[in-house]
Amino acid sequence: IEITANILKFQDADGKHLLPKIRDSAGQKGTGKWTAISALEYGVPVTLIGEAVFARCLSSLKDERVQASKKLKGPQKIQFSGDKKSFLEDIRKALYASKIISYTQGFMLLRQAAAEFGWSSTTEHRLMWRGGCIIRSVFLGKIKDAFDRNPGLQNLLLDDFFKSAVEDCQDSWRRAVSTGVQTGIPMPCFTTALSFYDGYRHEMLPANLIQAQRDYFGAHTYELLAKPGHFVHTNWTGHGGSVSSSSYNA
């Protein structure tokens, strides 16, 4: 965020801002890709980093996008008529909430890796980015405080500080995302962060339909809510045999 502010203000030798002169095709060295691959391997929804990587991939299709911009229609350009100062605050809060989600997901991945490799403590990992790193952040002090309060904390969003922070940002977050969608502005990280938050806070998700579909086309079985650990197969079409399993790993 600090360097972004500096970049936005930076002027070229001709007195004009430099940023609009830079080709909008982002490169990458692989750290984001490695993180996304690790998240998939460990089954952890690190969606923000994944979307950030894919957004760079999309940006690299510059020539295709130039052609697509001439053929694909979106919403008509809308002149913003609201309170700009108020909306800037909405964007600030949307950014803050999304940042919380990003760190939440990162520590979910670290937690899973710690379980896999038998790490006894991740305290050092919570502090290692505070300086000397491209993502150095004072924000990590709040994360350390959360785990100091509750060493067994399952998720940052369940800590009182972060829970209150996200709740305070929520209305602004939704307004910013909604405005972007209505005006056709791509916001992959804001939208996936909000989608993760809404998914995480729901007791029930439509994944039961996914399990039913998997059982329908592949007889993968599904677990019944009324019988935890009991997996069954349904003969959805009236044809074929039946399958049941108590040990299938869905």
Curated annotation (Swiss-Prot):
Keywords in alphabetical order: Acetylation, Cytoplasm, Gluconate utilization, NADP, Oxidoreductase, Pentose shunt
Which Pfam family is one of this chain's hits?
A: 6PGD
Q: Which residues carry this modification: N6-acetyllysine?
A: K77
Q: Which InterPro entries match?
A: 6-PGluconate_DH-like_C_sf, 6PGD_dom2, 6PGDH_C, 6PGdom_BS, Pgluconate_DH
Which SUPFAM superfamilies does this entry report, sorted A to Z? 6-phosphogluconate dehydrogenase C-terminal domain-like (SSF48179)
The UniProt catalytic activity note for this protein reads: 6-phospho-D-gluconate + NADP(+) = D-ribulose 5-phosphate + CO2 + NADPH
What are the binding positions for substrate in this chain?
A: K29, R56, R214, H220
Pathway, per record: Carbohydrate degradation; pentose phosphate pathway; D-ribulose 5-phosphate from D-glucose 6-phosphate (oxidative stage): step 3/3
- Subcellular location field: Cytoplasm
What residues does NADP(+) bind to?
A: S245, S246, S247, Y248
Example of a GO cellular component annotation carried by this entry: cytosol
Q: What is the lineage of its organism?
A: Eukaryota, Metazoa, Chordata, Craniata, Vertebrata
Enzyme's top EC category: oxidoreductase
The record's comment on protein family reads: Belongs to the 6-phosphogluconate dehydrogenase family.
Q: What does this protein do?
A: Catalyzes the oxidative decarboxylation of 6-phosphogluconate to ribulose 5-phosphate and CO(2), with concomitant reduction of NADP to NADPH.
One Gene Ontology BP term is: D-gluconate metabolic process
Q: Name one GO molecular function term.
A: phosphogluconate dehydrogenase (decarboxylating) activity
Q: What is this protein called?
A: 6-phosphogluconate dehydrogenase, decarboxylating
Assembly with partners or alone: Homodimer.
Gene encoding the protein: PGD
For this protein, the Enzyme Commission number is 1.1.1.44
